[in-house]
C-alpha cells in the first residue's frame, strides 16, 4: 500500500465508524501502513456454510447502503475476500481504493460491489436477490430488499 492509499483508507474508516458501519478500528497509521484493532473473524470466502446466509447478506448490503448514503463512501473493491465474519457479525475491510460518491465512476463501482456480493451468495449459498432491487436499496431509492433462498 502506498501513502495515499493508506490515507484514503484511514479517512474512509474515520467517516464510517461513527455511522456504525462495520469496519475495523484504526489503532495507528505510519506513512503507508495502518494498524487495525484485531478482529477474530475469517474471510467470508472461507465459509462453506453460514448459520443464516440471508441475514449475513442483508447486513453486508445494509453496510454498503449506510456507507454510500450517510458516509458518501464506496468501497470500490467489495467481494467475499473483503468481508470478515465471526459467526455472529460482519466487518467490511480493505478500504484503500475507496472513492467518494462524487467520483465520476461512483455508480459503476457501487453496482460492481453489489454484484460481486450477490454473485458470491448465489453461487455459494444459493441465495437469490434481484440485482436491480439490491441496487435501488443501497442507493436509497427503496427501503426494502427481497432475498430468497433457492
Where are these regions (language model features)?
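Protein kinase catalytic-loop region centered on the HRD/HxD motif
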Residues: 19, 62-73
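Conserved alphaE helix
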Residues: 52-63
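Flexible beta-alpha connector loops of hexameric P-loop NTPases
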Residues: 1, 48-49, 106
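A glycine-centered beta->alpha junction motif in the catalytic cores
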Residues: 32, 36-53, 97-100
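Hydrophobic residue at the +6 position relative to the catalytic HRD Asp in the kinase catalytic loop
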Residues: 78-85
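C-lobe/activation-segment region of protein kinase-like
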Residues: 69-72, 86-150
